[in-house]
């Protein structure tokens, strides 16, 4: 692999409360997963992030979530298929409207938090998200966890998919993310993270939390924008990859 996308979750501030440094991150990443108001983000803040993304020629995705502002979208929800379909359609539609006003477009969908993790293995909710995307625009790309059943299911239903790996998260030997409740699940050393992502691209996998090698085939790397180390981490990952002759660009 000589090309990879670098993405980040942005637009997650709320009113006077700021989350991350969106403007700086948008000068580094090639794709931006922009909050749609259900787990974070207010209309004015989202609009500003979209305008900044457009200015930096960054591709935009809808970062859809369960309706969970208090829990930042990290709490599982047992919702009906119809409710989840409507929630996802609503969020994509809202972001599309703001994107048009900002002079840009929404090109993909990446679910957030608990929804992201649930649909990686829960076919019932996965099909609801896939249906919602197709109802709005079947040209939208779905970004999901590398190696998950979701990606196969989405492809079977006519969606283009992108497999994603996480720069700042530890992996199990099975290639899944280590739970945030466990020690060592979140990585903070920018140099270590950069070396791991170079290994991912050049060797097709990373060292798991137990020291074994786990295979991960990914088209995009995510650096979480809410991490205090996000800017340095994203910058170091991009620089390390580019110095190794790897092109960092969006999958669109």
Curated annotation (Swiss-Prot):
Transmembrane segments: none annotated. Keywords: ATP-binding, Hydrolase, Nucleotide-binding. It comes from the Bacteria. One of its GO terms (molecular function) is 5-oxoprolinase (ATP-hydrolyzing) activity. It catalyses: 5-oxo-L-proline + ATP + 2 H2O = L-glutamate + ADP + phosphate + H(+). Pfam families: LamB_YcsF. GO terms for biological process: carbohydrate metabolic process. Its EC number is 3.5.2.9. PANTHER family: 5-OXOPROLINASE SUBUNIT A, UNCHARACTERIZED PROTEIN YBGL-RELATED. Belongs to the LamB/PxpA family. Forms a complex composed of PxpA, PxpB and PxpC. Catalyzes the cleavage of 5-oxoproline to form L-glutamate coupled to the hydrolysis of ATP to ADP and inorganic phosphate. This is 5-oxoprolinase subunit A. The gene is pxpA.
